[in-house]
From Swiss-Prot:
It is found in: Virion membrane; Host cell membrane. It comes from Murine coronavirus (strain DVIM) (MHV-DVIM). Keywords: Disulfide bond, Glycoprotein, Hemagglutinin, Host cell membrane, Host membrane, Hydrolase, Membrane, Signal, Transmembrane, Transmembrane helix, Viral envelope protein, Virion. Structural protein that makes short spikes at the surface of the virus. Contains receptor binding and receptor-destroying activities. Mediates de-O-acetylation of N-acetyl-4-O-acetylneuraminic acid, which is probably the receptor determinant recognized by the virus on the surface of erythrocytes and susceptible cells. This receptor-destroying activity is important for virus release as it probably helps preventing self-aggregation and ensures the efficient spread of the progeny virus from cell to cell. This is Hemagglutinin-esterase. Homodimer; disulfide-linked. Forms a complex with the M protein in the pre-Golgi. Associates then with S-M complex to form a ternary complex S-M-HE. It is an enzyme of class 3 (hydrolase).
Length: 431
């Protein structure tokens, strides 16, 4: 009986049938977009201009394809992040607009920096601030096209001026807090037990993200303990936003912030004791859009520096898709820049896809062996996500089509198996 090593046509047909039925259109672990209406916010790993500051002038420090540098769809600054620019004097004017928003930043404010507002403060409080900031930011950018950072002016009728309360130097990084602004104690007051107010106006944006912060604990000054309390009062609507100190602690005391989404209007900042704080910067949100989940790429150092998972905590379904690798960050330019795994994730920005989902991006919109979870776009076997519900509304037609195709695949497999068995029996009989 003759024998051949080549794959018989019928065997090849069987393999292709199985591959089509069980491995077609798998989700890709990338960030991508459905069309050209997208924008990326980043740091040095996507800052095309940073090459001018380097001794080794090549683009290996970036995790994006250099071809994207001329796209006009990136706002990024080496050494910075949206959180740093929002709170500190180290400022970059992050500005961008798009329907599909991608974030790849945050690593420049981690436990490696170890920021503390007070000498005996607690960096964990600031990690909590970071998580709350990005939670509000991601949720809002699922509903708005445009993001920018703006300054806020205020009017204070007292004689005291702004004071620097929070400054920290670590690992060569100096950070000075300037949002919110602290108003100093009036010289006519013997202590901090007095009420003070300042006026500020929010205008020019659809919504504003502003900080409301207190020292959550017993603040000691001149042998007296103070319970911090801060309020923002909307003069136009009568709505009062408040944040009070609730912890009975004296050590590990640090500034704790919540992040409010305020509408345009006239506001009064109020303090009942301790220092009055006034927002000096805001995230300006403009141009409402249909609900579109944002995409976040994990932003972390090589393991020789301490990182955090605050952006992962902030990025939750259904408003956010989180993308990550399973290995350590290991750059080629240096240990913290140019990682192959993250470059692979960002490579999805070079092309359009049909569908974005929890599992990844689907290139095609017909049939997939993986059922898209929390899908957005033209997705295989599923229609667009319905917001306000943690489940997907599915179009029955693709489901029927999938069932028909799977049924055909099963019939083909059964037929081929029967054919092979019959053919083998004939061959054995002839042999």
């Amino acid at each position: 009986m003759a024998r051949t090593d080549a794959m018989a046509p019928r065997t090849l047909l069987l393999v292709l049938s199985l591959g089509y039925a069980f491995g077609f259109n798998e989700p890709l672990n990338v960030v991508s977009h459905l069309n050209d209406d997208w924008f990326l916010f980043g740091d040095s790993r996507s800052d095309c201009n940073h090459i001018n500051n380097l001794s080794q002038q090549n683009y290996n420090y970036m995790d994006i394809n250099p071809e994207l540098c001329k796209s006009g769809k990136i706002s990024a600054k080496a050494g910075n992040s949206l959180f740093k620019s929002f709170h500190f004097t180290d400022f970059y004017n992050y500005t961008g607009e798009g329907s599909q928003i991608i974030f790849y930043e945050g690593v420049n404010f981690t436990p490696y920096v170890g920021f503390k507002c007070l000498n005996n403060g607690d960096n964990n409080r600031w990690m909590g601030n970071k998580a709350r900031f990005y939670t509000q930011l991601y949720q809002k950018m699922a509903h708005y096209r445009s993001l920018s950072v703006i300054n806020i002016t205020y009017t204070y009728n007292g004689s005291a001026g702004p004071v620097s309360m929070c400054k920290h130097i670590a690992n060569g990084v100096t950070l000075t807090l300037n949002n919110p602004t602290f108003i100093g104690k009036e010289v006519s007051k013997p202590d901090y037990y007095y009420e003070s107010e300042a006026n500020f106006t929010l205008q020019g944006c659809d919504e504003f993200i502003v900080p409301l912060c207190v020292f959550n604990g017993q603040y000691l000054s001149s042998k007296l303990y103070y319970d911090d309390s801060q309020y923002y009062y909307n003069v136009d609507t009568g709505v009062l936003y408040g944040f009070n100190s609730t912890l009975n602690i004296t050590s590990g005391l640090d500034l704790t912030c919540i992040y409010l989404a305020l509408t345009p209007g006239n506001y009064i900042s109020i303090s009942n004791e301790l220092l009055l704080t006034v927002p000096s910067k805001a995230i300006c949100l403009r141009k409402p859009k249909a609900f579109t989940p944002v995409q976040v790429v994990d932003s972390r150092w090589h393991s020789n520096r301490q990182s955090d998972n605050m952006t992962a905590i902030a990025c939750q379904l259904p408003y956010c898709y989180f993308r990550n690798t399973t290995s350590d960050y290991n750059g080629v330019y240096d240990s913290h820049h140019g990682d192959a795994g993250f470059t692979s994730i960002l490579a999805g920005l070079m092309y359009n896809v049909s569908c974005l989902a929890q599992q990844g991006a689907f290139v095609y919109n017909n049939v997939s062996s993986s059922w898209p979870q929390y899908p957005y776009g033209h997705c295989p076997t599923a229609a667009n996500i319905v917001f306000m519900a943690p489940v997907c509304m599915y179009d029955p037609l693709p489901v029927i089509l999938l069932g028909v195709l799977l049924g055909i695949a099963v019939l083909i497999i059964v037929f081929l198996m029967f054919y092979f068995m019959t053919d083998s029996g004939v061959r054995l009989h002839e042999a």
